[in-house]
Amino acid sequence: MSKCVVVFSGGQDSTTCLYWAKQNYSSVSAITFQYGQKHQAEINAAKKISELAGVVEHWVVDVTAMLKAKSALTDPEQNPGVFSQASEGRPNTWVPLRNAVFLNVAANYAVSWGSSCVVTGVSQEDGANYPDTTNAFIVAQQNAIALALGDVFEIKTPLIHKTKKQTVLFAKEITGCMEALKFSHTCYNGMTPPCGRCHSCVLRAQGFASAGIIDPIKMEG
């Protein structure tokens, strides 16, 4: 039986990866991280979509104590700002080493569940501003985990070379994915409906617009 664990935030990309995993693995579990983020919206979205997807296990793991370095996602005194501010240089929403922590903890849970595969929704398109979303980082992380285990281990990244437009078109071809995206949460400001101004909201809107598809969140609202 092929098994995998999906690193699942409840956002657009990880929801797409969760439903991709359901098509490609016979048994899928999800792991969601509480890392000190200022709002609960993404955790709630992850719980809702995991239930909708019918995953075998959905673990919610608190790693707040492992991520002391702050960002606008975790520090009450910082504001995520708007897209025009975030598009220049590294955005203040970057949490140093967050993906490294997520992948290592997810790998530990995967091994405990009898799996040698983790799926994550990182994209090389974000690599200029987020160094832990590059293919080079993923390859290095996969090799490090395999060495630490003394065994084969895979990190699958279905979206690594896709643009936001391509990600939307990819999701459209996956059974159940667009319906699930109705419940996903992307907004850095934790707003429902989404603020439409933060970096994450604008990139999501651009992706759906360029794909010529109405965002299911808008249809729901």
Where are these regions (language model features)?
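Glycine-rich nucleotide phosphate-binding loop and flanking beta-alpha elements
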Residues: 126, 208-209
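ATP-dependent adenylation/nucleotidyltransferase module used to activate substrates
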Residues: 1-177
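Short, intrinsically disordered, charge-biased short linear motifs at domain edges
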Residues: 173-176, 181-191
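Short cysteine/histidine-rich metal-coordination sites, predominantly Zn2+-binding motifs
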Residues: 212-221
